[in-house]
Amino acid sequence: MAAAKIIGITEIYKVGGIQAVAAVAYGTETIPKCHKIIGPGNSYATAAKRVLANHIDAGLPAGPSEIIVLADEKADPEKVALDWMIEAEHGPDSAALLVTHSKELVEKVVPIVNRQLEKISPKRKEFIETNLTTYGGVILTNSLDESIDFVNEYAPEHMEVMTEKPFDTLPKIKNAGEILLGDYTPVTLCNFVLGPNAILPTGGFAKTYSSVSVQDFLKRSSVGYASKDGFENVRDYAYRFAKVEGFDTHGLPVKERN
């Protein structure tokens, strides 16, 4: 509410779910039709946005939460275990993956997770246990490069890099909504205090989408102008292109213009 006041928002509607997506796409007696949806939702809201994409700009695909912790044999098992669980507590349809080539690390991390689960509320514990045995889990690879290949193919929403030299690993990561480097940059920090936008693409769409930014609230129009001299300098080229393309009425305006 404070942020809304600061930026001058004057109307707020308390509504959610797929019915909210339909309401802003079509408009109702109480909710006006909108141009664009910004923000995440569960799998149902994400599906609704896709269905209604011809009626409203659905924005980036931001569905159930995802995290990949990319770790090597030098990673701290305690920190890996704690951060691996972060996104898993959002709900049973979230995805939390530990990707590593170190079997020894996995053998240390799993008991730590089990121990930490005893400190968590029953609701969140159930989410995490469900998540780590369905959409989440451990991906054991043969090498760090193979782990990175998996990450780039998966294109996660959140990604933590817990390798011996995270800044050397960074240039190899091509597809991720956000990339958090080192032992002291958990997702929690980025969500609440570091500054990067927490609305990120999910479902593999980090291959083609970026996080929400001010650009999502802006649009631009192309503007062109040619003086008579400028027109004369390029008219022949434009006419030739039109002829090659077989567009007669594209060519006539430049051929016949005085």
Q: Where would I find each of the regions flagged by the language model?
A:
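C-terminal core of ALDH-fold dehydrogenases
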Residues: 152-258
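Structural motif
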Residues: 10-13, 34-38, 43, 59, ...
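Conserved NAD(P)+-binding/catalytic subdomain of aldehyde/semialdehyde dehydrogenases
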Residues: 6-86, 90-95
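Short, solvent-exposed amphipathic alpha-helical segments in soluble enzyme
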Residues: 2-6, 29, 53-55, 83-88, ...
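A conserved active-site cap/scaffold subdomain adjacent to cofactor or substrate pockets
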Residues: 60-134, 138
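Glycine-rich, Lys/Arg-enriched anion-binding loops that position phosphate/diphosphate groups
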Residues: 117-165
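Residues at or immediately preceding the N-termini of alpha-helices
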Residues: 18, 77, 103, 143-146, ...
